């Protein structure tokens, strides 16, 4: 009897040690299912006259779309320093690799940019294959490098018969993503056909927008509406060089598209004010779509990772290292990446975003509720010729606005700032996870500032993941009920595989937990790559047994 008891005690002790010593990882190991992608477009543009001093920075004659198309080559994609080999080594399994403008045969006169016929002069290793086999083999090669798969850029209005052929080719080749950068919004042939024969194909549509939101040159406003605003239907010129549409569509058309596609991209924005411009576009859409499941598309907001994490959106990330300078007036000229923010050095933000979406999947535009603060923040700065290709802004003060606080399916966070306030966003996801982010500001004398505030996040639950992005003076989690005495607070850099017990480093009160901003900075950047300046991104969980 004593022997049996002794054995039992040993077993219990061993089990206890095993549990105690077990490494807790708050981030799933399995790649996410969200349709995010990294896109070649910014890097293509940066390769024009690579490494050469700039004598003429004109985007209309030198650094043009046709010139960028010529950089879409086998060497630039698959070479030793090729994009598919360099980008996102840690999380490319969560991203499609989208080959952008220039991969198709440019000698085909009809619907030149919607043929799915690869240019074999640029990609000679696929020349001996028939067209549908080429994209299949490139998809195989992209996946072999660890990516989720190959995505295709297209633009145009093929006939219904042609569109069926292209969907069939994609099914044959295992292509799961089309970036439709204009077109197919009259009859939605692609949507109708893929729903019938290849529903796995994710379609992205646009209606277009200018690089900045409307009334940008008018001083003294507190609201600068986007083309998606229901208060004013703004019409702006599209990107220079666009041959499909010369103006954007009205808001009614945009809303129709969101009902008829899988992904709606809010479109490009000028780099210095990109976050403010994009936040306004998100607001102008969600205020009309939230709560109506007919709006089934997910919103893709380009390259604002922390905003997308906090609001349950998709990204089309395009940032990349800038290691072949094109110097002009003391700056490395890049019309798509500019300013003191240096997103080229914030590559880990892409990783942390993807890892968060393994925990909390994005939400359609029509899902749940949307709230926003009555107060808007306005950012402004004078654009120079090195900041953007958009010539009407050169030497002029550009102003953009967005709500100070935005929230989906959760109460608005409370924000207290002594001086300049950051933008604050938060969401609660269907699985109970919550995300919150702060975003920086742009002032006339500074193209990027990251102010800190005291933020209170409401409706927090025990044993549910909380994603925290950005910088804070403090972040207080409000649970709304007495906190059990046996809780343990774990936090983990999303790039790490090990959570840390921070219970003794936070302030626990009756119904709240206050986290110092310095602790968020420490934990959330713990795994930053060398020379990476990404904002903090971490996951926290309050565990109660």
Feature map (PLM): residue ranges:
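Short boundary motifs at domain starts and secondary-structure transition points
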Residues: 23-31
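Aromatic-lined carbohydrate-binding/catalytic grooves of carbohydrate-active enzymes
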Residues: 38-188
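Sec-dependent signal peptide recognition
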Residues: 2-8
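C-terminal (or distal) subdomains of carbohydrate-active enzymes
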Residues: 8-11, 461
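Active-site-proximal substrate-binding groove within the catalytic cores of carbohydrate-active enzymes
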Residues: 30, 36-39, 46-63, 155, ...
């Amino acid at each position: 009897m004593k022997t049996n008891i002794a054995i039992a005690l040993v077993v219990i002790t061993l089990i206890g040690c095993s549990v105690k010593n077990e490494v807790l990882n708050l981030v799933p190991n399995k790649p996410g299912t969200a349709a995010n992608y990294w896109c070649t477009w910014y890097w293509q543009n940066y390769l024009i006259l690579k490494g050469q001093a700039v004598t003429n920075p004109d985007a209309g004659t030198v650094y043009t779309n046709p010139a960028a198309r010529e950089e879409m080559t086998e060497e630039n994609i698959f070479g030793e320093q090729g994009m598919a080999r360099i980008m996102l080594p840690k999380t490319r399994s969560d991203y499609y690799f989208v080959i952008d403008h220039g991969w198709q045969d440019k000698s085909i006169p009809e619907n030149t940019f919607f043929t799915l016929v690869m240019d074999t002069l640029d990609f000679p290793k696929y020349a001996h294959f028939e067209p549908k086999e080429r994209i299949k083999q490139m998809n195989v090669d992209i996946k072999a490098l660890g990516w989720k798969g190959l995505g295709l850029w297209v633009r145009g209005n093929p006939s219904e018969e042609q569109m069926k052929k292209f969907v069939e080719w994609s099914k044959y080749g295992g292509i799961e993503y089309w970036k439709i950068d204009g077109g197919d919004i009259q009859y939605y042939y692609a949507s109708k056909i893929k729903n019938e024969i290849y529903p796995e194909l994710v379609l992205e549509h646009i209606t277009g927008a200018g690089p900045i939101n409307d009334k940008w040159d008018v001083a003294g406003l507190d609201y600068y509406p986007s083309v998606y605003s229901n208060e004013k239907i703004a019409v702006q010129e599209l990107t220079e060089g666009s041959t499909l549409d010369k103006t954007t569509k009205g808001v009614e058309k945009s809303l129709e598209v969101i009902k008829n596609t899988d992904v709606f991209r809010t479109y490009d924005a000028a780099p210095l004010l990109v976050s403010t411009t994009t936040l306004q576009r998100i607001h102008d859409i969600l205020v009309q779509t939230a709560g109506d499941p007919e709006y089934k598309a997910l919103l893709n907001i380009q390259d604002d990772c922390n905003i997308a994490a906090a609001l349950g959106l998709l990204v089309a990330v395009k940032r990349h290292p800038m290691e072949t300078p094109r110097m002009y007036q003391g700056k490395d000229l890049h019309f798509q990446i500019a300013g003191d923010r240096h997103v080229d050095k914030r590559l880990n933000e892409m990783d942390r975003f993807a890892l968060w979406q393994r925990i909390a999947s994005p939400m359609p535009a029509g899902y749940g509720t949307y709230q926003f603060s009555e107060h808007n923040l306005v950012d402004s700065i004078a654009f120079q010729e090195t900041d953007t290709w958009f010539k009407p802004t050169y030497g002029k003060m550009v102003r953009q606005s967005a709500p100070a606080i935005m929230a989906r399916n959760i109460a608005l966070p409370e924000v207290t700032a002594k001086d300049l306030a950051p933008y604050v966003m938060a969401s609660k996801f269907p699985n109970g996870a919550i995300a919150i982010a702060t975003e920086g500001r742009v002032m006339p004398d500074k193209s990027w500032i990251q102010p800190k505030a005291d933020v209170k996040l409401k409706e927090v639950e025990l044993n549910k993941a909380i994603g925290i992005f950005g910088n804070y003076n403090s972040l207080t989690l409000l649970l709304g009920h007495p906190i059990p005495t046996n809780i343990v607070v774990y936090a983990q850099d999303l790039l790490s595989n090990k959570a840390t017990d921070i219970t003794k480093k936070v302030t626990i009160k009756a119904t709240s937990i206050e986290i110092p901003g310095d602790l968020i900075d420490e934990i959330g950047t713990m795994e930053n790559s060398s020379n990476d300046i990404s904002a903090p991104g971490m996951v926290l969980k309050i565990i109660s047994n």
